[in-house]
Amino acid sequence: MPTGKLRQKPPYAAIMTNSPVTPSTETQQPKRYARFLPQEADAPPVEWLITEGLTDYEEALAFMEARVQAIREGTASELVWLVEHPPLYTAGTSANAEDLLTPDRFPVFNTGRGGEYTYHGPGQRVAYVMLDLKRRREDVRAFVASLEQWIIETLAAFNIKGERREDRVGVWVVRPEKPRLADGSMCEDKIAAIGIRLRRWVSFHGIAINVEPDLSHYGGIVPCGISEHGVTSLVDLGLPVTMGDVDVALGKAFESVFGPRQTK
């Protein structure tokens, strides 16, 4: 992994929205937003779709665009779509060109999501989250905190303690077995990334959890613009889990945080 100093950025940098954001005095306390349930007791369940094999990234973008439009128009239900992609890099709206270290290594896609550079590839579970926040809460920071909570509860099913950081969106794992950083602080690795976009309060893009990707593929970028910390995966942490195991845990944790889902 590249080394260097952590480039400071504001919290929730992995957000891109063209929906109005109302400031809240509570947004400094993400734990208060552990649940992001529908406001209506009889709200329909969220559709839960798993696609086997590797999904072309451009096809995934086109699918999300169409689905978000349909959700806005009321002709389709909310959806969480679980996929894997072939190896590729994506650039968010805050991406710094200098953080793309080997531009010819894998295809690079510019996306409308918030955030910087990240990697997608086999062994990583990507969950595209298409929810209508008007049905829940028009609070972007609360939504991101709930996505973090979803990941944290998923990892807890495997006895992994995932942690959030106020200045770094995503979920982190403390690595006490690794050498401490130059400032004496404990080493931390990122195990899950978050990058979203909102269109009139309907979300798309989502989260990515490292199950068993080739971690060397991250060497072509500075992940999320953070060079001081590395990346890890469930298998890298010594857990012989499968993608199916993770999908089960994701489903249970989703219902805890966001409410009922329906598989097809």
Swiss-Prot record:
This enzyme's EC code(s): 2.3.1.181
Domain of life assignment: Bacteria
Active-site positions on this chain: C224
GO cellular component: cytoplasm
Record keyword Metal-binding present: no
Listed GO MF terms: lipoyl(octanoyl) transferase activity
Site (Lowers pKa of active site Cys) location in chain: K190
Keywords annotated in UniProt: Acyltransferase, Cytoplasm, Transferase
Catalysed reactions, as listed in the record: octanoyl-[ACP] + L-lysyl-[protein] = N(6)-octanoyl-L-lysyl-[protein] + holo-[ACP] + H(+)
Short name of any one Pfam family annotated for the protein: LplA-B_cat
A GO biological process held by the record: protein modification process
Record's subcellular location: Cytoplasm
Pathway: Protein modification; protein lipoylation via endogenous pathway; protein N(6)-(lipoyl)lysine from octanoyl-[acyl-carrier-protein]: step 1/2
Residue sites binding substrate per the record: R113, G114, G115, E116, Y117, T118, Y119, H120, A193, I194, G195, G206, I207, A208
Domain BPL/LPL catalytic: 74-262
Record family assignment: Belongs to the LipB family.
Role this protein plays: Catalyzes the transfer of endogenously produced octanoic acid from octanoyl-acyl-carrier-protein onto the lipoyl domains of lipoate-dependent enzymes. Lipoyl-ACP can also act as a substrate although octanoyl-ACP is likely to be the physiological substrate.
Note, other: In the reaction, the free carboxyl group of octanoic acid is attached via an amide linkage to the epsilon-amino group of a specific lysine residue of lipoyl domains of lipoate-dependent enzymes.
NCBIfam families: lipB (TIGR00214), PRK14341.1 (NF010921), PRK14345.1 (NF010925)
Protein's name according to its UniProt entry: Octanoyltransferase
Lineage: Bacteria, Pseudomonadati, Pseudomonadota, Alphaproteobacteria, Hyphomicrobiales
Record gene name: lipB
